[in-house]
From Swiss-Prot:
Reversibly catalyzes the transfer of the carbamoyl group from carbamoyl phosphate (CP) to the N(epsilon) atom of ornithine (ORN) to produce L-citrulline. It comes from Desulfotalea psychrophila (strain LSv54 / DSM 12343). One of its GO terms (biological process) is L-arginine biosynthetic process. This is Ornithine carbamoyltransferase. It is found in: Cytoplasm.
Length: 303
């Protein structure tokens, strides 16, 4: 397994499956009251240039739940805002902590930290990839539906960082993935082409969301305007209007289809209130699973 978690493209399908299986095991053990101390005496630095609720709390809870300690640094708490070279920060932080979890804008930040750090670097989100979230999502799908290789997974909306990580996961784990995105909002072309060449099942890009969701087992949606895109909000709401996950769309999916949303949700925009609060939506189980998945990731890379 790689020394860092930069993107899912760096892993084999077996390595991804092993991480998810371990997360499910850790969740089950916690439900039985088993407490873990695998990372006692170790510390991790959370460097978050982008603010977060779920990602921060789930990583902190995961580290504490394994007996470790957490140091949280916002963008204001580091010298990055004053243009400190990343290679300097990486080497200094490596002498203070046992791992670095980064939530930032450019993927190049994670890549350079990983190049110079002597401790594991974990990508908690960039504009290009969101690997930890997709691992948590897949864990949720497996819990609810069984083997993911037998399922039709559909991504509806912006071809953003989550879409890119879903594409890489589909290639590695061998499941069918359909992405429905408006023209001009496609996932990364290089990531898509590489995954289509590698994957055992089709990875397809469509424009029409109603066609994409026909018979879908899993529908995955995210906000139409991500953090940093606030100035595009009004335009995006118009462009993505037909990509809203609502009762009409759900009627075209399989009867037992589930809906994923990483949260926070903008009710009435990318998803309607009735779907988000309905029995087919598993967003809150998905949110819980971030903590268990992060435990498995921290245990693997820092243990």
């Amino acid at each position: 397994m790689p020394d860092h978690l930069s993107s899912l493209g760096d892993f084999t399908g077996e390595e991804i499956a092993s991480l998810i299986a371990r997360a499910i095991e850790l969740k089950e053990e916690r439900s039985r009251g088993i407490r873990h101390q695998q990372l006692a005496g170790k510390s991790v630095a959370l460097i978050f240039e982008k603010p977060s609720t779920r990602t921060r709390v789930s990583f902190e809870s995961a580290m504490y739940g394994l007996g470790g300690q957490v140091l949280f640094l916002s963008g204001r708490d580091t010298q990055l805002s004053r243009s400190e070279p990343l290679k300097d920060m990486a080497r200094v932080m490596s002498r203070y902590v046992d791992g670095i979890v980064v939530r930032t804008f450019g993927q190049e930040v994670v890549n350079e930290l990983a190049q110079y750090a002597t401790v594991p670097v974990i990508n908690a989100l960039t504009d290009l990839h969101h690997p930890c979230q997709i691992l948590s999502d897949i864990m949720t799908v497996i819990e609810k539906k069984g083997a993911i290789q037998d399922l039709k997974i559909v991504w509806v909306g912006d071809g953003n960082n989550m879409a890119n990580s879903w594409i890489q996961a589909a290639a590695k784990l061998g499941f069918e993935l359909i992405l429905a995105c408006p023209e001009g909002y496609d996932p990364d072309a290089e990531i898509l082409a590489a995954a289509q060449a590698e994957g055992a099942k089709p990875i397809t890009l469509l424009r029409d969301p109603q066609t994409a969701v026909l018979g879908a087992d899993v529908i995955n949606v995210d906000v139409f305007a991500s953090m940093g895109q606030e100035s595009e909000q009004d335009e995006r709401l118009k462009i993505f209007a037909s990509y809203q996950v609502n009762a009409e769309m759900m009627a075209k999916a399989a009867d037992d289809a589930i809906v994923l949303h990483c949260l926070p949700a903008h009710r009435g925009e990318e998803i309607t209130e009735d779907v988000l609060e309905g029995p087919q939506c598993v967003a809150f189980d998905e949110a819980e699973n971030k903590m268990h998945m992060h435990k498995a990731i921290l245990e693997r890379f820092l243990g």
